[in-house]
A protein has these predicted regions:
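Basic/aromatic-rich interaction segments and small domains that mediate binding to polyanionic partners
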Residues: 2-89
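Non-Sec secretion/translocation targeting segments of pathogen effectors
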Residues: 86-98
Length: 98
């Protein structure tokens, strides 16, 4: 298999593993001049043809994560359930009027 075919297969595997909407946590980003803070959660928006995960982070920033350079992982089922519980708590909070 040549290099281009290997890169194409890698990108396809990233697209299958991290479809749009996948929740991730960025563990570290070393080689960016303005890195996202460690342990910031985000949502995969798309994976491009070289396997970069383009994400919207919970801190309001958007940036590409480069597999092999940046350290990240999918949120566990337990972490996803905790996020849903937090969202439910916010939805059920009393509304304060003025």
């Amino acid at each position: 298999m040549n290099r281009l075919e290997a890169e194409r297969r890698f990108a396809q595997r990233m697209k299958e593993t991290y479809p749009p909407g996948t929740r991730i946590v960025l563990l570290s980003m070393e080689n960016d001049p303005r890195p996202i803070e460690d342990n910031t959660r985000g949502t995969v928006m798309t994976v491009d043809d070289i396997g970069t995960l383009h994400c919207d982070f919970d801190n309001g920033r958007s940036l590409g994560i480069v597999p092999g350079e940046d350290s990240f992982r999918r949120l566990t089922d337990e972490e996803l359930a905790e996020e849903q519980d937090e969202d439910m708590d916010e939805d059920n909070a009393p509304v304060m009027g003025m």
